[in-house]
Amino acid sequence: MANLNQSEQKILAARTAVETLVQKGLIFSGMKIGLGTGSTALPAVKRLSEYIADGTLKDVKAVVTSFQTENACADWGVPVYSFKDRCICGELDLEIDGADEIDNDCNLIKGGGAALLREKIVAYNAKKFVVVADESKAVSSVGTKFPLPIEIIAEAYVPVKNKLEKMGAKCTLREGVRKCGP
């Protein structure tokens, strides 16, 4: 992948991951799949939509981690459901998502796109969790290139910030935009 730019690497990694998961039977007709958020997850969603459109996959039910992914699924014909829907029953067969950083021990940072809570809920309720990433996400130790996202409710902002700063953390408030929706 050395001759590809970062965007091309992400697309190749995502498409290859979905193709491999289909070939190995981990993505299959009738499954309930979690679909992640971000620049690597979206090409995976696009490839999944192509399998649905050509009839290779049928009756796939997706639960998404963000407004961004929900819109992409609508545009590309991937049926979206909620954990509240009876056909999902609060459990997914597999989730596929990207990451912000991954170290050699497979520790990772997620949630940098401001969809952390939904990403955690979907991952927790999936039997299998697949992370797709290009080489730019590889680090020797997580937290070296990307800040650790912490999602809190507005009412808890001041006390949580105070406690984190007492522990030596540098806190920066980031308001949800783009992937989180309006």
Question: Where in the sequence are the language-model features?
Answer:
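Active-site catalytic microenvironments in core metabolic enzymes, especially phosphate/sugar-handling
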Residues: 1-32, 37-88
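Conserved phosphate- and dinucleotide-binding cores of soluble alpha/beta proteins
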Residues: 2-12, 51, 68-182
